[in-house]
């Protein structure tokens, strides 16, 4: 289920209700269509710390008038070291290093003035390495692949509303040792909308407010989970965000309230977020997210 770990401080702070959001390499992990109208090159690092582990996603985005928007990304998740000990004495003689890696290549393009489309191909790898005296410790390296696809559409009404649909983690079962031990990928279907509250701009100059609402579930969409988020910005410089994930999907994802802040300084965008899910917060260690983007 490491493919479901949320990536990106902005996305987390908005309650992960981001399927209709545009701009920023976080869209690689949510809806690749959100990259379609990017106008500047971007290098970004998205860092996370949670009870699951510590992870970093690095992305490079390149917009081309002729080809569309191309993005390459790597996500690395370290779920913690485990000691190898001598039976009976407990003396540590080695260290087990379990890790997850995802390599992603994304293509996105606008279609006319109202439609965005995007596709991501991902190669996921689970590795268990060992250092030191590792006799009897299994060394594992398993690789699988998946596809994410999404579209966004600007509704032709006076209000600025975008809707989005994305399917993530489509692909064959992830095989660890043999076919009997393979697991199906956590495929998700997410639909939602974002609305820019333009009437507030006339009341508070320089203030922009955007609200998002999404639903997400497995492909059967029998019991979708709702997600909401709001983004308040002042002169495109300072941002306050909040969101809520109402329930988990099949016990696989974190849920609860989230908050975040963002600052823009020239070409640099800094975003921070915290997710107050019941389990991690109960242990006094809510997941923390930090994103740094450089646009040029």
Positions of PLM-derived features:
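Subset of outer-membrane beta-barrel
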Residues: 1-296
């Amino acid at each position: 289920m490491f493919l479901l770990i949320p990536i990106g401080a902005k996305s987390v702070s908005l309650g992960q209700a981001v399927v209709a959001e545009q701009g920023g390499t976080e869209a690689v992990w949510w809806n690749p269509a959100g990259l379609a109208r990017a106008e500047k090159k971007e290098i970004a690092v998205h860092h996370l710390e949670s009870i699951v582990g510590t992870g970093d996603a690095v992305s490079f985005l390149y917009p081309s008038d002729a080809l569309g928007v191309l993005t390459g990304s790597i996500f690395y998740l370290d779920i913690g070291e485990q000691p190898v000990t001598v039976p009976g004495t407990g003396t540590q003689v080695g260290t087990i290093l379990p890790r997850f890696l995802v390599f992603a290549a994304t293509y996105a393009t606008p279609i006319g003035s109202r439609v965005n489309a995007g596709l991501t191909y991902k190669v996921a790898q689970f590795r268990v390495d060992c250092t030191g005296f590792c006799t009897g410790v299994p060394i594992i390296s398993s690789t699988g692949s998946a596809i994410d696809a999404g579209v966004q559409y600007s509704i032709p009404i006076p209000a600025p509303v975008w809707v989005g649909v994305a399917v993530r983690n489509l692909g064959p079962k992830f095989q660890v040792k043999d076919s009997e031990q393979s697991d199906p990928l956590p495929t998700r279907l997410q639909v939602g909308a974002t609305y820019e509250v333009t009437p507030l701009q006339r009341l508070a100059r320089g203030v922009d407010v955007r609200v998002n609402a999404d639903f997400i579930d497995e492909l059967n969409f029998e019991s979708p989970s709702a997600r909401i988020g709001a983004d308040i910005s002042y002169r495109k410089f300072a941002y306050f965000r909040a969101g809520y994930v109402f329930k988990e999907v099949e016990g696989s994802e974190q849920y609860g309230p989230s908050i975040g802040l963002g600052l823009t300084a020239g070409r640099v965008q800094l975003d921070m977020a915290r997710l107050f899910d019941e389990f991690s917060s109960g242990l006094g260690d809510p997941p923390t997210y930090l994103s740094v983007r450089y646009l040029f």
